[in-house]
């Protein structure tokens, strides 16, 4: 796909792989911002704010016109789960998700430097985990896979066997709702025709 200078404001290899799978050309310029939720902030508002913040921060660091930022959380019984702090936190998260439906919420923002505005959206996907045995959780944690993933799991990797079903976008659970992102890029003129 043709593009007009797209910059991905994320170091996530999964997000890069998803964009590459759609044939989108882009550069990676990770942007670090404070990811702590504001007191009383709703989950959708939180991921949208972070996504836009990352996109705008990348625009301060790099040349380009379109800056794509994203943030993903797992939401279970009102708790916002980001990336686990350590093995104990990963175990706590996976125990909480065990046998319980939860939501993966990804906010994405495309900041257009020329128009000085952003398209911001959030996509929700419902995920159903099977009941996990302690041994499964500990074995998965031992792989090191949970530590850079919201909710301590990667549906496309070692945690695939934990997921019974999903309702909604699979790529959203991976970290970027590709269908919606490509549509938004096309609408704002970042992909040509």
Swiss-Prot record:
The active site is at 71 (proton acceptor). It comes from the Bacteria. The record marks 14, 72, 156 as: Important for substrate specificity. One of its GO terms (biological process) is nucleotide metabolic process. Its cofactor is a divalent metal cation. It is found in: Cytoplasm. Keywords: Cytoplasm, Hydrolase, Nucleotide metabolism. GO terms for molecular function: dTTP diphosphatase activity; UTP diphosphatase activity. It is an enzyme of class 3 (hydrolase). GO terms for cellular component: cytoplasm. It catalyses: dTTP + H2O = dTMP + diphosphate + H(+); UTP + H2O = UMP + diphosphate + H(+). Belongs to the Maf family. YhdE subfamily. This is dTTP/UTP pyrophosphatase. It comes from Citrifermentans bemidjiense (strain ATCC BAA-1014 / DSM 16622 / JCM 12645 / Bem). The lineage of its organism: Bacteria, Pseudomonadati, Thermodesulfobacteriota, Desulfuromonadia, Geobacterales.
């Amino acid at each position: 796909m043709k593009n007009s200078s797209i910059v991905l404001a994320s170091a996530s290899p999964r997000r890069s792989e998803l964009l590459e799978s759609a044939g989108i050309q882009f550069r990676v310029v990770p942007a670090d911002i404070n990811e702590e939720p504001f007191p009383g902030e709703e989950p959708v508002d939180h991921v949208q704010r972070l996504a836009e913040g990352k996109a705008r921060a990348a625009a301060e660091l790099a040349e380009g016109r379109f800056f794509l930022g994203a943030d993903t959380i797992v939401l279970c019984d009102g708790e916002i789960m980001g990336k686990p702090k350590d093995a104990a936190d990963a175990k706590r998260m996976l125990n909480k998700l065990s046998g319980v439906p939860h939501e993966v919420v990804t906010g994405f923002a495309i900041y257009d430097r020329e128009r000085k505005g952003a398209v911001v959206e959030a996509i929700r996907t419902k995920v159903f985990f099977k009941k996990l045995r302690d041994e499964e959780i500990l074995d998965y944690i031992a792989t090191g896979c949970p530590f850079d993933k919201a909710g301590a799991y990667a549906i496309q990797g070692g945690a695939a066997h934990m997921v019974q079903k999903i309702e909604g976008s699979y790529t959203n659970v991976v970290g970027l709702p590709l269908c919606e992102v490509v549509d938004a890029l096309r609408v704002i003129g970042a992909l040509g025709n």
